[in-house]
Swiss-Prot record:
Heme b b566 binds at residues 97, 196. GO terms for molecular function: metal ion binding; ubiquinol-cytochrome-c reductase activity. Binds 2 heme b groups non-covalently. This is Cytochrome b. Its cofactor is heme b.
Length: 380
């Protein structure tokens, strides 16, 4: 078996990636989220495949087909809720994974980091299109509002929106193409994940100390396979509690009303994992400015290697930047809360303040804190 593991052309790749992979001996549970994201992706592809067998992407039957899945298909309700809440678990793991990368300076592995940002965009696009498919009120109006933002692009905006819609409004053509893209994108994401891993294995993993760990590596299996398995059990426990006891807690009640173009819901909002970006979008009164701020809220991650001023890689030994980091986390939670609130006083001013703080912390305060720490520790 050992000979086959090390010699067989295909098994050799798996061996070098998951079995004999040299791994730093001190990586903590924050490094579990990569494997958990892989698990989430597998769950989403499998549940999505079974949903696609019964779903119809037609405006007249889409809502009914989802109801049919929940009522008449064997364990259809479970598959549907696993898929819906699986997306939430996916994003929880994603945000923690990115947060870990920022905290421990993993963004200095530039190719891996940039590939991760592309993956984040791809997953967000997939989730957005998936939210449109049940064809409830929030599906329809969410699709209308978010796609309509592209009309802010000068000259080509309106034409572009009508091209995406396949007509003059969100209708049958839009739903059909969104279903097609929602189906294909997870497989593209899987390919991008392999590229992400390829880049990661070129440099090796980072570690909590941020130091070179070449002198102290251990094989991935059995040490980290068993550690990852514990993370998998905890994730599945949380996932099953969410799916079986509170399946609708993260959803919107409006989506249980069939889509009606003549009746606008009182508060149009996306799923909870987009609320922080939605709050940033709404905090700018100008349409184009809001769209740019929305895109920049994610693209700014690509500039983190350039904004790294400290001589140390991680925040483990940098209390000033640590404080800035946790203020940023709190700020993102505030933005998430604001994104779900109506556009009125005092939520408007809180959202604008939190949006300014988000960009200021990343672009101004964290780099300055890094320079101050260099001075204090005399690392110049």
């Amino acid at each position: 078996m050992t000979i086959m593991r090390k010699k067989h052309p295909l098994i050799k790749i798996i061996n070098h990636s998951f079995i004999d992979l040299p791994t730093p001996s001190n990586i903590s549970s924050w490094w579990n989220f990569g494997s958990l994201l892989g698990l989430c992706l597998i769950i989403q592809i499998l549940t999505g495949l079974f949903l696609a067998m019964h779903y119809t992407s037609d405006t007249s039957t889409a809502f009914s087909s989802v109801a049919h899945i929940c009522r008449d298909v064997n364990y259809g309700w479970l598959i549907r809720y696993m898929h819906a809440n699986g997306a939430s678990m996916f994003f929880i793991c994603l945000f923690l994974h990115v947060g870990r990368g920022i905290y421990y300076g993993s963004y200095n592995m530039i190719e891996t980091w940039n590939m991760g940002i592309i993956l984040l965009f791809a997953v967000m696009a997939t989730a957005f299109m998936g939210y449109v498919l049940p064809w409830g009120q929030m599906s329809f109006w969410g699709a209308t509002v978010i796609t309509n933002l592209l009309s802010a692009i000068p000259y080509i905006g309106t034409t572009l929106v009508e091209w995406i819609w396949g007509g003059f409004s969100v209708d049958k053509a839009t739903l059909t193409r969104f279903f097609a893209f929602h189906f294909i994108l997870p497989f593209i994401i899987t390919a991008l994940v392999l590229v992400h891993l390829l880049f990661l294995h070129e440099t090796g993993s980072n570690n909590p100390a941020g130091l070179n760990s070449d002198a102290d590596k251990i094989p991935f299996h059995p040490y980290y396979t068993i550690k990852d398995f514990l993370g998998v059990l905890i994730l599945l426990l949380a996932f099953m509690i969410l799916t079986l006891f509170f399946p609708d807690i993260l959803g919107d009640p409006d989506n249980y009303t069939p889509a009606n173009p003549l009746n606008t819901p009182p508060h149009i909002k996306p799923e909870w994992y987009f609320l922080f970006a939605y709050a940033i979008l709404r905090s700018i009164p100008n349409k184009l400015g809001g769209v740019l701020a929305l895109i920049l809220s994610i693209v700014i991650l690509a500039f983190m290697p350039l904004l790294h001023t400290s001589k140390q890689r991680t925040l483990a030994f940098r209390p000033i930047t640590q404080t800035m980091y946790w203020i940023l986390v709190a700020d993102l939670l505030i933005l998430t809360w604001i994104g779900g609130q109506p556009v009125e006083y005092p939520f408007i001013i809180i959202g604008q303040t939190a949006s300014i703080a988000y960009f200021a912390i990343i672009v101004i305060f964290m780099p300055i804190a890094g320079m101050i720490e260099n001075n204090i520790l005399d690392l110049d």
